[in-house]
A protein has these predicted regions:
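Mobile genetic element proteins and their domesticated derivatives, centered on retroelements
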Residues: 11, 28, 57, 79, ...
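Active-site beta-loop-alpha junctions of metal-dependent nucleic acid enzymes
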Residues: 33-34, 84-106
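C-terminal domain-tail junction helix/linker
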Residues: 173-174, 178-230
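Conserved beta-strand -> loop -> alpha-helix junction used to position metal-binding or nucleic-acid-contacting
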Residues: 118, 129-162
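Acidic/histidine-rich, metal-coordinating catalytic segments
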Residues: 109-122
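Active-site proximal helix-loop segment of RNase H-like, two-metal nucleases, encompassing DDE(D)
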Residues: 158-177, 195
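Short, positively charged, Gly/Tyr-enriched micro-motifs
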Residues: 1-54, 58-64
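An active-site-proximal beta-strand-loop segment
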Residues: 56-72, 76-78
Length: 230
């Protein structure tokens, strides 16, 4: 309900009909953080059947007067977000960590990685994917650079970012600590990959396209919680 757009207080009102003594909105928020972190121990280690292109992009946030960034990497075929992180700065080390996670999730399937024109991506992709350089002519990937101001960026990842922006700007707790913001965004990634259906992939979730053998039940959140405990 939370990631679908319902506020914590609206969820509280709903739960009071069933559990009046255990439904304060602060308790609900702690559940969201707890289970997002719990499920991520499972989902962060899954491998997917991807296409041949990944797209990486960043979103700027201002939290408590500071500039922060949400960086995500999407498989353009299945729409599956293969890696993401909420961070204080776009350092080479931070970006490399996210792209390495994308490489781990997709294995050797990727041929193209598309990014914007941010300086430093060449170094990041060299570290994470072995990008071809003057000294390494056996690179398995091509770095496709798209300058947003010149040609526009990929509408698939732009739609994802519009969805995230619309939701996070009103989220209670998102503007608190870095750890809470990171957990909330991890939950958003899980919701996007495993729960939310997409018209662009015939009404399926990205996980149904990318991990068809997973075969989740109707209550996908509960299913993922149980799987993360095994």
């Amino acid at each position: 309900m939370y990631y679908a757009g319902m506020s914590l207080r609206k969820i509280q009102e709903h739960l009071q009909m069933f559990a009046p003594k255990n439904s304060h909105y602060s308790t609900i928020y702690r559940w969201i953080v707890k289970y997002a972190n719990m499920i991520s121990t499972l989902t962060d280690n899954l491998q997917i059947q991807s296409g041949q292109e990944l797209m990486s992009d960043e979103m700027e946030y201002h939290r408590l007067g500071e500039q922060n960034w949400f960086v995500d990497v999407m498989d353009t075929t299945t729409r599956y977000v293969v890696a993401s992180d909420y961070m204080k700065s776009r350092t080479i080390e931070n970006l490399t960590r996210v792209l390495k996670k994308g490489k781990l999730t997709t294995g050797e399937q990727i041929k193209v990685v598309t990014t914007d024109g941010l300086k430093g991506y060449e170094r990041v992709l060299k570290k994470s994917f072995g990008l071809k350089t003057h000294w390494n002519h056996k690179s398995p990937i091509i770095h496709n650079v798209v300058i947003a101001s010149e040609r526009g960026f990929n509408h698939k990842i732009e739609r994802l970012h519009n969805t995230i922006r619309d939701r996070t700007k009103i989220m209670r707790g998102f503007h608190g600590s870095l750890e809470s913001a990171r957990a909330i965004m991890k939950g958003m990634e899980i919701y996007y990959n495993f729960v939310r259906k997409h018209q662009g992939i015939d009404g399926k979730t990205p996980s149904e396209e990318a991990i068809p053998e997973l075969n989740l039940s109707t209550n996908k959140w509960l299913n993922l919680i149980k799987m993360s405990k095994t």
